[in-house]
Every structure is written in structure tokens, then in C-alpha cells.
């Protein structure tokens, strides 16, 4: 199985662009925030956006729990996936995910700054800060089985000027950990959590 990495800061619009990047690089599936997604189906995993706090969400996204990692490894083994897109906030986070899922190093790494303008990234960050909304690259009807938070699914692309542009392959959600104000966790803190998790994980 081959791996393509997609890296960008938290809230920069990675999940919004994930399906397009996956198609461009001929990826059969996506790993995003603890979920293994193929087409419009979730093959395995648990969404990090279902966690009650941001620290637990980061641990979920890197498959910190052995049972979570094992479930997704088994789902990968049962699948016919040949190339997979892994989404993360840093190269180190990519490495941790591939280690936990026993996947090879990425053939290529795409950075959000390679495919999105500074203005587009700023707009995505502002949307995250203002509304606390997150995008999951899977239809709402499928995600409802795996997510218990608030759904704010819109019938159009919030990043497009064309309100007639439908995005039925994505869901817009508000995780439980974003209900209570706008407490933020920076990418530096995410990196610290990933680093500290090394001590509790056996690759």
C-alpha cells in the first residue's frame, strides 16, 4: 500500500480539500482525524471530533489507543486499498500515524500552502475561529453513525462564492469540545501532545 501525506495547520482547510487531493493523486481512501474513509463510506475508526476535549481529540487522531489502531489496521487489511491519503497537521504527526497503522513512509507530501493561497487559508482559519465548525470528508448520513456532536451541514460549499455548488460528499460539524467558548489549541501544543504520546505508545 502506498501513502500520500497531506499536511497543514489546524483549521487551514485540509479536510475541505481532501477529496480533491485524493482524486488528483489517485488515492483510494483517506485517513482523517481517526477515521478510515473510502468513497462515501467509513470503513473503520472513531472520529476525533467525537472526543470531549482537544487533548483526547489529538490522541484519537494519531491512533493512540491500541484498540483504535488495531481496528483500522484490520479494516485496511480487509480492503483493496492501494494508495491512501493521510491528513495531519505536521510531518511528525504523519509519521506517528503511519507507525501506528504499520504503513510505509509517504511517497509524497502535499502541503496546504502548495495548493491554497494565503487568502484562502486565512479565510478557513477565520471560519474555524468564528464558528468552531469542522469539515469531515464523508456524507452526513454516513457520519451520523460515528459522530454524536452537532451537525451544521449546508447544501453548498461555504468557501465558494457560488451557493449552487453542492458538496454532498462532505459534512460540517461542531465537535463537543468546541461547544464551550473558543478555547484554542495551537499547532505547537498539538505537536507537544504527539511528542508526549511517544512515551505511552509502542510502535
Could you describe each region identified by the protein language model?
Residues 2-22:
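Glycine-rich phosphate-binding P-loop
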Residues 8, 87-89, 185:
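Conserved residues at beta->alpha junctions
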Residues 13, 17, 93, 186-193:
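Short amphipathic alpha-helical segments
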Residues 26, 77, 102, 194, ...:
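Signal for well-folded cores of large energy- and translation-related assemblies
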Residues 28-85:
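Conserved nucleotide-sensing/catalytic segment adjacent to the nucleotide-binding pocket
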Residues 110-202:
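C-terminal accessory "lid"/substrate-recognition subdomains
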Amino acid at each position: 500500500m502506498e501513502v500520500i501525506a497531506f499536511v497543514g495547520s489546524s483549521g487551514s482547510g485540509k479536510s475541505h480539500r481532501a477529496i480533491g487531493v485524493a482524486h488528483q493523486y489517485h488515492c483510494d481512501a483517506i485517513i482523517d482525524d481517526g477515521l478510515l474513509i473510502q468513497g462515501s463510506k467509513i470503513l473503520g475508526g472513531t472520529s476525533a471530533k467525537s472526543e470531549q476535549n482537544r487533548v483526547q481529540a489529538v490522541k484519537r487522531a494519531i491512533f493512540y489507543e491500541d484498540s483504535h489502531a488495531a481496528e483500522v489496521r484490520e479494516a485496511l487489511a480487509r480492503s483493496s486499498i492501494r494508495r491512501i491519503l493521510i491528513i495531519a497537521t505536521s510531518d511528525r504527526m504523519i509519521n506517528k500515524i503511519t507507525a501506528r497503522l504499520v504503513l510505509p513512509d509517504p511517497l509524497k507530501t502535499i502541503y496546504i500552502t502548495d495548493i491554497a493561497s494565503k487568502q484562502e487559508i486565512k479565510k478557513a482559519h477565520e471560519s474555524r475561529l468564528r464558528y468552531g465548525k469542522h469539515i469531515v470528508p464523508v456524507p452526513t448520513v454516513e457520519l451520523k453513525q460515528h459522530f454524536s456532536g452537532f451537525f451544521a451541514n449546508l447544501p453548498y460549499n461555504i468557501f465558494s462564492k457560488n451557493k449552487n455548488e453542492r458538496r454532498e460528499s462532505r459534512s460540517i460539524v461542531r465537535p463537543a469540545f468546541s461547544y464551550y467558548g473558543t478555547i484554542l489549541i495551537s499547532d505547537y501544543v498539538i505537536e507537544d501532545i504527539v511528542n508526549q504520546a511517544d512515551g505511552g505508545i509502542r510502535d
